């Protein structure tokens, strides 16, 4: 049976990029992500996952990239996203997530052990740098 692709929402705001600490520790810190359901568009899956896991309402703003994840072998779709109604994020699925944080790129790199997908890293460099220069 083919496994469904996974969407990762790269949510940025004036506070930085949203990351989550997983309860199972695999990996300890990650972006908000989940399986794309059959017939679901990646952008709709990103909106659904972020809402379920953080309570945030977001809008997907574009594709960052795709790849087969080097550790899981899963097809990954990375989407840029922005909050539409505030930035207060709370853990919505305590079985899956332990903590949410808005962080800068250096903190995200440190928390994720330098494993951020190159296309995502480049997007965050550009996006967060533009934010910092405003």
For each predicted feature, which ranges?
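Conserved N-terminal beta-strand and adjoining loop/helix that marks the start
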Residues: 1-17, 35, 64
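A short coil-to-beta-strand element that immediately follows conserved catalytic motifs
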Residues: 57-65
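Structural detector for helix-capping/boundary residues
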Residues: 34, 48, 61, 103-106
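Conserved Nudix-box catalytic region and its N-terminal flanking loop in Nudix hydrolases
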Residues: 12-52, 56
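Active-site-adjacent beta-strand/loop module that shapes the phosphate/pyrophosphate-binding cleft
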Residues: 67-90, 101-107, 116-127
């Amino acid at each position: 049976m083919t496994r469904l692709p996974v969407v990762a929402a790269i949510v940025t705001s004036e506070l930085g990029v949203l990351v989550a600490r997983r309860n199972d520790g695999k990996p300890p810190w990650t972006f908000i992500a989940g399986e794309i359901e059959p017939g679901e568009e990646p952008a709709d899956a990103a909106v659904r996952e972020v809402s379920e896991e953080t309570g945030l309402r977001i809008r997907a703003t574009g594709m960052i990239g795709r790849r087969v994840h080097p550790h899981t072998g899963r097809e990954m779709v990375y989407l840029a996203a922005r909050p539409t109604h505030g930035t207060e994020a709370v853990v919505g699925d305590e079985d899956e997530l332990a903590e949410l944080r808005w962080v800068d790129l250096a903190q995200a790199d440190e928390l994720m052990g330098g494993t951020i997908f190159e296309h995502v890293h480049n997007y965050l460099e550009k996006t967060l740098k533009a934010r910092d220069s405003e």
